[in-house]
Amino acid sequence: VTAPDRTIWWDAPATTAAALAVLRLTDGDVDAGRVAAHVDPAGQIINQRLDRDPVDAYTTATVPAEVAAAHVTVVVNLYRAKDQPAASIDGMMLGAVPPSYVDPLAGARALIDPHRTRRGIG
């Protein structure tokens, strides 16, 4: 069984620009670098979900539009989760604010799943 593809198929500057547009930020904003830092991790999260064989790796020219759109969504989700508190024992105490969990693939699964290949089966 081969490991899922980890190829970098995305265009980082284009993905960053699209995510900044969704967030209504510009290249000059303080958080622009933070948004850009989420591009590669978001792509690898999508690679894991796609579970593609490395032989079927996408290139920047062959990536489906839905997968590229999902990539922007995951980048935005990761950016929006930046200020969330980590889960802690305090979340279990009476009167404490419970920790929340942001699913980075929320809103992106419907775009990604039609392009999955092995579906976790070796």
Task: List PLM regions with ranges.
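Divalent metal-cofactor coordination and adjacent catalytic microenvironments
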Residues: 1-122
